[in-house]
Amino acid sequence: MSRSQKNDNFIDKTFTILADLILKFLPTNINAKKAFSYYRDGMSAQSEGEYAEALANYYEALNLEEDPYDKSFILYNIGLIHASNGEYVKALDYYHKALEANNKLPQALNNIAVIYHYQAVKASEINDLETAQALFHEAAQYWKQAIKLAPSNYIEAQNWLLSTGRL
């Protein structure tokens, strides 16, 4: 039984039923349908904190998915898991891959900026000011791109850019 068939709450059950109907009637090839099923199971596992299971499902979806736009969201979610596990280098790699597949993904740009900002703060704490400035600069560049794509989002980033003279 797939993970999505085990959902216990009403919203998850409703989503699962709708997703199954869409899969059944959507005129796509079998690999695209399988990829979506793995992606859906990955999202379900991720939402429950089952990151190993989520990653396994996302990797299966990634192997089956052919559409770059759809792949970008799989790659993005893999990046989210690595970031939440503190694996920032891996997270950055997957966020960049997501952007290669879909350069209109402001959430990936934002998350890259957040990681660079975090690393800059850590560098500042140990008085590595040159590294900190370089990382703050990188964060600013990615936040500017994210804000350009989604001007009403990332208000805190906009405020930081303004208050630090980077906007």
UniProtKB/Swiss-Prot annotation:
<comment type="function">
    <text>Essential for the assembly of the photosystem I (PSI) complex. May act as a chaperone-like factor to guide the assembly of the PSI subunits.</text>
</comment>
<keyword id="KW-0602">Photosynthesis</keyword>
<protein>
    <recommendedName>
        <fullName>Photosystem I assembly protein Ycf3</fullName>
    </recommendedName>
</protein>
<dbReference type="GO" id="GO:0015979">
    <property type="term" value="P:photosynthesis"/>
</dbReference>
<keyword id="KW-0677">Repeat</keyword>
<feature type="repeat" description="TPR 3">
    <location>
        <begin position="120"/>
        <end position="153"/>
    </location>
</feature>
<comment type="similarity">
    <text>Belongs to the Ycf3 family.</text>
</comment>
<dbReference type="InterPro" id="IPR019734">
    <property type="entry name" value="TPR_rpt"/>
</dbReference>
<keyword id="KW-0472">Membrane</keyword>
<feature type="repeat" description="TPR 2">
    <location>
        <begin position="72"/>
        <end position="105"/>
    </location>
</feature>
<dbReference type="InterPro" id="IPR022818">
    <property type="entry name" value="PSI_Ycf3_assembly"/>
</dbReference>
<keyword id="KW-0150">Chloroplast</keyword>
<dbReference type="Pfam" id="PF00515">
    <property type="entry name" value="TPR_1"/>
</dbReference>
<dbReference type="InterPro" id="IPR011990">
    <property type="entry name" value="TPR-like_helical_dom_sf"/>
</dbReference>
<keyword id="KW-0934">Plastid</keyword>
<keyword id="KW-0793">Thylakoid</keyword>
<dbReference type="GO" id="GO:0009535">
    <property type="term" value="C:chloroplast thylakoid membrane"/>
</dbReference>
<keyword id="KW-0802">TPR repeat</keyword>
<feature type="repeat" description="TPR 1">
    <location>
        <begin position="35"/>
        <end position="68"/>
    </location>
</feature>
